[in-house]
Amino acid sequence: MIELVFSYIFSALLLTLSHRFKSLELKVLIKSFAFTLIAIATSLMYYAGVLDVVSLVLGISFSAIAILVSIYAIYYAREQHYPESLEPIIDLFLLAIIATYTSPSFIMLVITWTISEVLGFTLIRMGEEHSIEGSLTSSRGFILTSTMTYELSVFTMITLSLTLTSASVSLMELSKPFTSTTLTLNVPTPVIPLLVLGFLAKAALIPLHFWLPSAHTAAPAPASAVLSGLTVSLGFYGLYRLLTYLRLNYATHIAWFFVVTGALSTLYGGFQALSQRDVKRLLAYSSIATSGFISTRFAMYLIRPSTATLWGLVLGILMHAAYKTTLFSEAGLVETVYGTRYIHGIRGFIAVAPISSIGGIASLFTMIGVPGTIGFVAKIVAIYSVFSTYNVDVALAIAALIEILIYIIISALIALKYVHLYYGEKVAIVKPVVLRAPTGLQAPILILGLSNFVYSFTLLGTGIYELWLPLLVPIPLAMVFLYILAAHFKALTERVLHHELGRG
């Protein structure tokens, strides 16, 4: 574990050092090396038996995302005239989040998670102060709801372990790697709500969802991408790690709670997203809907821990990270190009930002569930895992299946609403302030979007061999479809813009 901690510290020093250089190429190189170092350290700790496969997959995947978001933040801060401190805070925030997902023990997880909460609050506060809207309530909602409830759950866990075991044994076990700890606690039923409260708030499940839309809207775009794509899922990751230590006597009842709250979150978040004009609020509410979907995946794992249910949970987290970091980054580009986030009057974005639009459309493919994307894989594995729990509780399996189908429909509807940003029948109301979006902002979004295809190959390492064929066969078709669709939209919107310029 010492080697992993050293890699965190060394990477933090490299990221801090990168901001002293004026050369963009050198900055990009140092940032890429720092996050790659974390991915390498994660792999080494996995092969040493310190980390499990969940930390391995999420650690490497999120390190790749971190490189792209970090590079995007360089250009975003300049275009939006943010203080120079935005870049290093974003980098340290990314590092803290990855360190949380790759923490080998509960104690280290608590430390890195707390650091990420402080940095997240700082970024939201920075966005509030930079915004012309002048709202100063989002950061307070974040710190009071997301952060304080999490600290309450951590305090409950540590107190419970100290009460049920000796202090020395408890702290020693909580400091051991998750892969080797032997601590098992019989949790009294009245204590369970206190244990899960903070994780529910972080996941923004109903009724603890209210802090998320304003916080994710107020933050700078790269921070919103990380807050939504990576930190919301920490709630479910924390619950997964909590199960390492707990012996639950009412697992089925708790699973029902997660399915019901998941369904409510999917419905509420989905319908709210469909009624939004602000692109960041649309994406924020869709995060609540996706949290509902992942909540159902966690419920299935809770009643029957297996390869299928575990990967159903992990792939749901990966899906959310891939498409949400892409679209929130694109939201920042939309604001840069048009000077507004209200997309109901924007058409023809693909002509202004042809490179990044391919990444954005790839993310919409994930939301729709186009074969070959991580969205398709996550939804297929989710349905498969439900059938694997059918013999445990039939009613629960049926309820979970209904929730998944609801999410599939709502997610597709949100994607169809968003796609009008690129093209549409109506003449654009809002005109771009630049003829071509900066390439420095477009390129990271393109690669982030393509991760929706790359991450689908995660299925090959799950051991669910019967699902390999549906993954592999349609991928070339999806890539061809993406190219044809992008070319069509570009030609269409260029004609519309040419017509408008001719009228002017």
Task: Locate predicted features.
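Structural signature of hydrophobic alpha-helical transmembrane segments
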Residues: 1-10, 52-64, 106-119, 188-201, ...
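Residue-level recognition of transmembrane alpha-helices
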Residues: 5-8, 31-32, 62, 90, ...
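C-terminal ends of transmembrane helices
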Residues: 12-24, 67-81, 121-134, 203-217, ...
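Alpha-helical multi-pass transmembrane bundles of energy-transducing inner-membrane proteins
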Residues: 25, 86-183, 272-342
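Hydrophobic alpha-helical transmembrane segments in multi-pass integral membrane proteins
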Residues: 32-99, 225, 235-241
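Short helix-boundary/re-entrant hairpin motifs in multi-pass inner-membrane proteins
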Residues: 50, 75, 85, 126, ...
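Cytoplasmic/organellar membrane-interface segments at the starts of transmembrane helices
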Residues: 131, 168, 350-355, 412-504
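Interfacial segments of multi-pass membrane proteins
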Residues: 294-304, 379-396, 401
